[in-house]
Amino acid sequence: MIHIKKLKNMKNKEFIIKAIMSGLLIGLCADINNRIGGLCGAFLFSIGLLTICMLELSLFTGKVGSSNDAKELFTTFVLNIFGVIIMRILFTFNNMFVLGIGCGMLMQIGVTAYKKNLPILTIMCVMAFILAGYKHCIAYAYNSLDVMSFALIVLGNIIGAKICYYGGVKL
């Protein structure tokens, strides 16, 4: 009996992570779209949905048409909104650290997409981080040697990549 309960708890934890991660991705891509705008911003917004589909994450608007489980749909909705709110709050602080997080997330998505034989998604991630003004520590080193900014970008890149990795953006 304990093993079944443990398995159920593991599935619940996985469900929660997948739903929050979906919200984080939609929030990230909403920020990209807000920064870039127009056709290009709209096109790059699809990074979120492509990643959610690639990794079988849990997005309310991707489930609502095919699921009749009201409790699961409601929970997914709430957790998606929670993820979006986290990103909205984060991106109100438009500094090197936060811009590094955005880039770190996109680089983790891009590398994972490449390993899953989706190179167009990899290219889209590079386009998004450049056009949105997110900061890549290695590219930044070419342009500036401001040590404090560089350190914040490195830390942001690490945290952004780890958020995605532990949220399921991996092989």
Residue ranges and their predicted role:
Residues 1-171:
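Alpha-helical transmembrane segments and their helix-helix packing motifs
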